[in-house]
Design a protein with these regions (language model features):
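Charged, heptad-repeat coiled-coil alpha-helices that serve as long linker/dimerization "arms"
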Residues: 1-110, 356-364
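Ribosome-associated translation termination/rescue signal centered on the conserved GGQ peptidyl-tRNA hydrolysis loop
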Residues: 90-364
Length: 364
């Protein structure tokens, strides 16, 4: 591990030197590439530098204890020695986690699909609340959210909604939300006061870039149509809605299937086409990486972020004001704040659980 850390320290110094060269500054593509590499290894370098300083502090404190006869100074040295030893242990664990292979999708934007499960209007209302929860959470992270497709009930619920979250590291955080979310509460329409259970499923997909998948755009069949919704004469006269059909062969199964995607969210047909293509790329990328996801799921016992969308991951119990995440057996009692987007504490616990799991799998 320490040989690798020394190599990274040397590489960081090389990058700093290269970035200061005029020819690099005049080459935007190379400059961006080097800046990305530098920012990726900076947290490791900073932690390792602190680790080395703490090791030096331990040596200095031990030397002081051998040489110093003044009792007050010896006590100070003992205190500094203890602090340095504790920090070294913490940093060793941090460095092991920082050296774990990074998920190649972690830096990507995400496309989130929320679908109401069984439960009629109540399930659709819960799906809409889950959407708003993520919307509010995204605001706290300074991320941008944009609806791509929505099937609303007209009474505040959503049968389904697909939206994009754009922001640094969105997938690294949102990937923990894939799965079935279950709600237990008394619906507004319930006259007997009985608690009902309904659910919504969430799929979080890393947005695929154009170079991530191969699509023969000449084989896409496009249809246009008048999109429904509020907003004046444009809705009736302009065919801004788009529908694409694309035959795709799954490389993992060898089976060909037709992909159908509609986009009606804007009154700008080119923009709707662009969004439909983005969803097509993401769908194919997700399917092509399913084997990788399945392999991870088969190896891991806790399934913190395997992407298994059929797994029941969380229960929202309104009568008790309780949220329980079943993957890590974690319960909190701040449901109102949680539904308003205060989910970071839960995300942090899931991140720690996954890193612990990955450390067990690694040889570090």
């Amino acid at each position: 591990m320490f040989d690798k850390l020394e190599d990274l320290l040397i590489r960081y110094e090389e990058l700093m030197s290269e970035l200061s060269e005029p020819d690099v500054a005049n080459n935007p593509e190379r400059f961006r590439k080097l800046m990305k590499e530098q920012s990726d290894i900076l947290p490791i370098v900073e932690a390792y530098k602190e680790y080395k300083q703490c090791k030096q502090n331990i040596e200095d404190s031990l030397a002081m204890l051998e040489e110093e006869s003044d009792e007050e100074m010896r006590e100070l040295a003992k205190e500094e020695l203890n602090d340095a030893k504790n920090r070294v242990a913490e940093l060793e664990n941090e460095l092991k986690i920082l050296l774990l292979p990074k998920d190649p999708n972690d830096d990507k934007n995400v496309i989130v699909e929320i679908r109401a499960g069984a439960g009629g209007d109540e399930a659709a209302l819960f799906a809409a609340e889950i959407y708003r929860m993520y919307q509010h959470y995204a605001e706290t992270k300074n991320w941008k959210t944009e609806i791509m497709e929505c099937d609303d009930t007209g009474i505040g619920g959503m049968k389904s909604v697909t939206f994009m979250i754009t922001g640094a590291g969105a997938y690294s955080v949102m990937k923990y939300e894939s799965g079935v979310h279950r709600v237990q509460r008394v619906p507004a329409t319930e006259t007997q006061g009985r608690v009902h259970t309904s659910a919504a499923s969430v799929a979080v997909l890393p947005e695929a870039e154009e170079f991530d998948v191969v699509i023969n755009e000449g084989e896409i069949k496009w249809d246009t149509f008048r999109s429904g919704g509020a907003g004046g004469q444009n809705v009736n006269k302009v065919e801004s809605g788009v529908r694409l059909r694309y035959i795709w062969k799954n490389p993992n199964t060898g089976v060909a299937e037709e992909i159908l995607i509609e986009c009606t969210e804007t009154r700008d047909q080119p923009k709707n086409k662009e969004r439909a293509l983005a969803r097509l790329r993401t769908f194919i990328y997700d399917k092509e990486h399913q084997k990788y996801v399945d392999d991870i799921a088969s190896k891991r016992k806790t399934m913190v972020s395997t992407g298994d969308r059929s797994a029941k991951i969380r229960t929202y119990n309104y009568p008790q004001g309780r949220i329980t995440d079943h993957r890590i057996n974690y319960t909190i009692y701040n449901l109102a704040a949680f539904m308003d987007g205060d989910i970071q504490e839960c995300i942090d616990k899931l991140t720690v659980a996954e890193n612990t799991e990955r450390l067990k799998e690694s040889e570090l």
